[in-house]
């Protein structure tokens, strides 16, 4: 990326930055949202995580050395926000046993894909170990390679392969039991 474009990206409110963020949003929002839904089991919480990631990208744009790394930054930001959300939920459930009411409004995506199937898969995914769920979400929702998944989660490629294998095996067993 040219030095002039990089300088434009870092400026406060330039058309280049606004266009860059708009392009990132259009290209990656859906995949990031799917990642969040798989990790959290809640579309609303996933939307918040993705929105927060884009806000953080805007807020920290001056420290982003390479705008080409923005996609990886967004993935990591969404994943970290999902982890934080899960930790908060565990803490809240442990300290106050209240049921969280989910918003059951159907989105056009839910209707198209088959809301029941999506909810069933998300429910089964939520029973997996956290790391298995993260790896499977990266590999099959975001369609990242083993290397990209390892970099995003900051684990070895061998760990990605092992968690993928174990996670898929567990998913298959749980789905067979559910049928």
Segments predicted by a language model, with ranges:
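Arg/Lys-rich amphipathic alpha helix in sigma70-family domain 2
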Residues: 59-65, 76-97, 106, 114
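DNA-recognition helix of helix-turn-helix
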Residues: 79, 83, 153-179
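Structural recognition of an alpha-helix C-terminal capping motif at a helix-to-coil junction
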Residues: 48-55, 68-80
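C-terminal edge and immediately downstream basic/flexible tail or linker adjoining helix-turn-helix-like DNA-binding
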Residues: 2-12, 20, 93-96, 114-115, ...
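Short, charged helix-capping/linker segments at alpha-helix termini
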Residues: 12-23, 33-52, 62-68, 157, ...
């Amino acid at each position: 990326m040219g030095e002039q474009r990089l300088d434009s990206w870092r400026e406060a409110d330039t058309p280049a930055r606004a266009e860059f963020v708009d392009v990132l949003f259009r290209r990656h929002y859906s995949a990031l949202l799917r990642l969040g839904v798989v990790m959290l089991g809640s579309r609303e919480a996933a939307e918040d995580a993705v929105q927060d990631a884009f806000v953080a990208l805007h807020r920290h744009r001056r420290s982003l050395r390479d705008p080409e790394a923005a996609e990886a930054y967004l993935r990591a930001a969404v994943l970290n926000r999902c982890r934080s959300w899960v930790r908060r939920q565990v803490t809240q459930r442990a300290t106050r046993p209240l049921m969280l009411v989910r918003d059951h409004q159907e989105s056009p995506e839910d209707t198209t894909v088959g809301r029941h199937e999506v909810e069933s898969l998300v429910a089964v995914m939520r029973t997996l170990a956290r790391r298995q769920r993260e790896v499977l979400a990266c590999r099959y929702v975001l369609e990242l390679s083993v290397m990209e998944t390892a970099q995003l989660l900051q684990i070895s490629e061998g760990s990605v392969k092992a968690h993928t294998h174990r996670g898929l095996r567990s998913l298959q067993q749980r789905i067979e039991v559910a049928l």
